[in-house]
Design a protein with these regions (language model features):
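Non-catalytic structural scaffold of enzyme domains
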Residues: 1-122
Length: 122
C-alpha cells in the first residue's frame, strides 16, 4: 500500500475550486481536503489583523484534524495577508496563489492575463 499525500486547499469561498482542479491534475495520486471559509466571506472586506486572527487558528484546527502534507492557500487575499504568519506558526508547507501569477504570465500565449482581486490583494 502506498502512502498518498494529503493536500488541503483553502479558500474564503468557492473560487478555489479552479485551483483545486489544477492541483488534482498535477497530483492525481493525492488525497484532497477542500475548505471554504464562507462564514468570514469575503476576505477582502477584513483588515489584515482580522484575517490573521481568523485564519491562523482556523488553520491550526485544520492541520490537527486532517494532518495535511501540503496546504494550498487558493485565496489571493489570504495569500497576501496571512501566508507569512501561517508559515511562521506551522511546520506544514504552505503554497500561495500570488507567487503563481508570474509563471502564469510567462506561459500565456496571448501575453494578456486578468487578475481578480480585492482591495486587500491588489
Amino acid at each position: 500500500m502506498t502512502n498518498r499525500p494529503t493536500i488541503l486547499v483553502f479558500d474564503s469561498g468557492l473560487g478555489g475550486l479552479s485551483v483545486l482542479r489544477e492541483v488534482v491534475r498535477a497530483r492525481p495520486d493525492a488525497h484532497y481536503v477542500y475548505v471554504a471559509d464562507d462564514a468570514f466571506f469575503p476576505y477582502g472586506h477584513h483588515s489584515q489583523e482580522a484575517l490573521i486572527a481568523r485564519v491562523v487558528p482556523l488553520m491550526g484546527e485544520l492541520i490537527a484534524g486532517h494532518r495535511p502534507d501540503l496546504i494550498v492557500i487558493a485565496c489571493n487575499t489570504a495569500s497576501v495577508q496571512t501566508l507569512a504568519p501561517l508559515r511562521a506558526a506551522y511546520a506544514t508547507p504552505f503554497v500561495g496563489t500570488v507567487p503563481a501569477i508570474k509563471p502564469a504570465c510567462a506561459q500565456s500565449r496571448t501575453k494578456r492575463v486578468s487578475v481578480l482581486g480585492t482591495k486587500a490583494t491588489v
